[in-house]
Swiss-Prot record:
Function, as annotated: IGPS catalyzes the conversion of PRFAR and glutamine to IGP, AICAR and glutamate. The HisF subunit catalyzes the cyclization activity that produces IGP and AICAR from PRFAR using the ammonia provided by the HisH subunit.
UniProt-recorded name of the protein: Imidazole glycerol phosphate synthase subunit HisF
Signal peptide start-end: none
Annotated GO biological process: L-histidine biosynthetic process
Pathway named in the protein's UniProt entry: Amino-acid biosynthesis; L-histidine biosynthesis; L-histidine from 5-phospho-alpha-D-ribose 1-diphosphate: step 5/9
Cellular compartments annotated: Cytoplasm
SUPFAM superfamilies from the UniProt entry: Ribulose-phoshate binding barrel
Length: 254
């Protein structure tokens, strides 16, 4: 028996509600995150990812409440990212019921944060999120961006991922800005390049549109696949994806 692949729905949460927008702009209310989480757990999700897209510090406490409420009702691993800037933020999220914490722009601004979190809580808690765009300006052809892909950092995505792994990142959440929202499949070259860096688990994100899109991402080297809008809209269920993966010869949890 091999290791089962993971299917992970992602919820963008702002001020305690699930929202949908394009690159964090024009956010529209989609509903209660606890209800979404319960539904996905019932469908067989292996994990859940919450991304806090709240713009203001005032609403951060609402996010902790949402995490607490979700963790009290849903018993699958929960990763929370967005706005994590310190080990204190991580401690509060873990104390609220998160199992793992995602860091992105704060780690780019201060890479030492990765080591601080890993040293205090363990690498297994730390997910490095990367929003990656194809770019001729980097050696690998892939650049790290922030602000939903609108701001280029000048960092080579593969170099940054390798450095973060050295500092203690225990997992990579790799989101293709180019593929995101296209529903035309994941960026397989990007996944292969990230897989070649190390044995650290890779979560592929960006581009899922149909059940046939998921198996190629896993064959390219991803350990898990993440999607948002196709699940929220009801176009696909977690079960649909797992059925397709099992038919493709992959081991999935029920």
């Amino acid at each position: 028996m091999g290791v089962a692949v993971r299917v992970i729905p992602c919820l963008d949460v702002a001020a305690g509600r699930v929202v949908k927008g394009v690159n964090f702009q024009n956010l529209r209310d989609q509903g209660d995150p606890v209800e979404f989480a319960r539904r996905y757990a019932e469908q067989g999700a292996d994990e859940l990812t919450f991304l806090d897209v709240t713009a203001t510090v005032d609403d951060r406490s609402t996010t902790y409440d949402v995490v607490r409420a979700t963790a009290g009702q849903v018993f699958i691993p929960l990763t929370v990212g967005g706005g994590v800037r310190s080990t204190e933020d991580v401690a509060r999220l873990l104390g609220s019921g998160a199992d793992k914490v995602g860091v992105n722009s704060a780690a780019i601004a201060r890479p030492g944060l990765v080591a601080e979190i890993a040293d205090r809580f363990g690498a297994q808690v730390l997910v490095l999120s990367l929003d990656v765009k194809r770019s001729a300006s980097t050696d690998s052809g892939f650049a790290v961006t922030t602000h939903g892909g609108r701001t280029e950092t000048g960092l080579d995505a593969l170099e940054w991922a390798a450095r973060a792994i050295e500092l203690g990142a225990g997992e990579l959440l790799v989101n293709s800005i180019d593929a995101d929202g296209t529903k035309e499949g994941f960026d397989l070259e990007l996944i292969r390049e990230m897989r070649a860096l190390s044995a650290v688990p890779v979560i592929a994100s960006g581009g899922a549109g149909k059940t046939a899109d998921f198996a190629p991402a896993l064959r390219a080297g991803a350990d898990a696949v993440l999607a948002a809008s196709v699940f929220h809209s009801g176009e696909l269920t977690i079960g649909d994806v797992k059925t397709a993966l099992a038919a493709a010869g992959m081991e999935v949890r029920p």
